[in-house]
């Protein structure tokens, strides 16, 4: 599966970066004193990818099944040491769902593309250009 080319360039500020994803753009930064606190930091971006993907995947399945899911609220935190980066995900399903529907949607949460990607062997290939 191919993806958008993500472009990252320095923006105005200490270390603030402009991130362009297709036609969309946003900033990443670090809090003071390292940065200016004008955007999420890279860890927050990684963590939020899982949260957004979880909510979108669960909502899409519930809509397809015409279940009364009004909202999916996801809270992500992480814990890190030298050997492990642990994401803790709490999911709230808002709506008058049966226990069976809730259990099914919790299983779907683990099938979101980012959750699956984070459980694969990850490789990062870097090349110096220019």
Describe each PLM feature range:
Residues 1-48, 56-130:
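Extended beta-strand/beta-hairpin segments
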């Amino acid at each position: 599966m191919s993806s958008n080319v993500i472009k990252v360039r320095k923006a105005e500020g200490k270390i603030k970066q402009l991130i362009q994803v297709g036609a969309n753009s946003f900033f990443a930064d670090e809090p003071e004193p390292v940065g200016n606190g004008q955007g999420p930091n890279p860890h927050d971006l990684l963590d939020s990818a899982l949260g957004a993907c979880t909510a979108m995947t669960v909502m899409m399945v519930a809509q397809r099944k015409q279940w009364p899911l009004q909202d999916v609220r996801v809270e992500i935190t992480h814990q890190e040491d030298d050997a492990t980066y642990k994401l803790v995900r709490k999911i709230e399903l808002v709506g008058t769902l049966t226990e069976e529907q809730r259990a099914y949607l919790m299983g779907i949460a683990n099938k979101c593309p980012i959750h699956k990607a984070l459980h694969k062997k990850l490789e990062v290939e870097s090349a110096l250009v220019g």
